[in-house]
Amino acid sequence: MKKGFSLPLWVAGAARSALKKLVGLSFENYELIKIPYEKKEIKIEIHSVGLLKNDSHALGITFAKSGLDLDITQNLEIWTIASLEKISFENSLQRVPINIIAGSGVGIKEDTSEICISNFAKEVLYENLLDIIPEGFNLKLEIIFPNGAFLAERTSNQSFGIVDGLSIIGTSAETYSSASPDQLEEAKNNLAKLIQNDFKGEVVFVIGENGLNLLKTHNVNLPIIKIGNWIGPLLVDAAIKKVKTVILFGYHGKLIKLAGGIFHTHNHLADGRIEILVYLAVQENVPFEIIVKLSKLDNIENALLFLEKFNQSTADKLFKRLSNTIEKRSFAYVNRYVKTDMEIASIIFDRKRKIRWAGIYGKKYISYFQ
């Protein structure tokens, strides 16, 4: 399996190189990036660095190597522009002397216009920049992805209220393919560690970075494991390990595949999401002319918007059926391989990161997420 590093490390590498240039330190074609709370450094290659605007700004450039051929950030060009601002009375109370700005191609939250960056990414930047900032100054750091706006069109960012570019939401240093068998083994090992000691029987399987970030804002007091696309085999592994309840938590665009019996959910292997929704609409007795229109839409997000515009009650009934079907099909899938009474609950959030729907079992646990 190819090994690579997440986007925050490459951003930090370019930023550290730019800041060092700005304060007169010599250029090297790599930066050793420290990982928060870990005793290791990772070597990040730097493409180039230079001074701008009468030497008042410095530009650092690198190209991300995620190690994943299908990853949207593989070979992503990253620019960081560093400049220093003398601390004045007005900003003397700023807790962290780093102002991170979303430049061209970097995603922002549509409702607040704030840069979309994970806490892990911020911590990596702080860990690797604070020791270089001269005393009495704040660092202004602008992050630019020259190709970010174009690449963002191939993601579901806009569904989550993220516009104008790619978000910086990595939550760990290393990357691995979510379709790789090695990823499955790592997830199994993580599950084994989670259910040791005082394990109460319930575990949350969260699908994707957006789901993980949302969970962190709700302070869910349950063991949590972020899983990739090997959802089915991990459910079976949980049953073998005598887990009592697995709570599937994710965005409807990913979880809907389980309702259609697709338990390895990488889009390059199988999709069928609109077809599954059409089948569920037939089961829910949605008017035929609406079903025909649904079948012609290009993604689940547009389908939900269309249904809500047609009739909010119908949309909610259909997505509740989706939640119940996810639970039923998942239970049937697991019992093909191991006889178990393990409970499988589904809880689904929408494009606005609002937790909206839950299956029969999911309703028992939804209060944990609110």
UniProtKB/Swiss-Prot annotation:
Taxonomic lineage: Bacteria, Bacillati, Cyanobacteriota, Cyanophyceae, Synechococcales
Pfam families per record: CbiD (PF01888)
Gene: cbiD
Source superkingdom: Bacteria
Enzyme Commission number(s): 2.1.1.195
GO biological processes: anaerobic cobalamin biosynthetic process; methylation
Family assignment from sequence similarity: Belongs to the CbiD family.
Family annotation (HAMAP family): CbiD
Keywords recorded for this protein, A-Z: Cobalamin biosynthesis, Methyltransferase, S-adenosyl-L-methionine, Transferase
Identification of the protein by name: Cobalt-precorrin-5B C(1)-methyltransferase
Molecular functions per Gene Ontology: cobalt-precorrin-5B C1-methyltransferase activity
InterPro entries associated with the record: CbiD, CbiD_sf
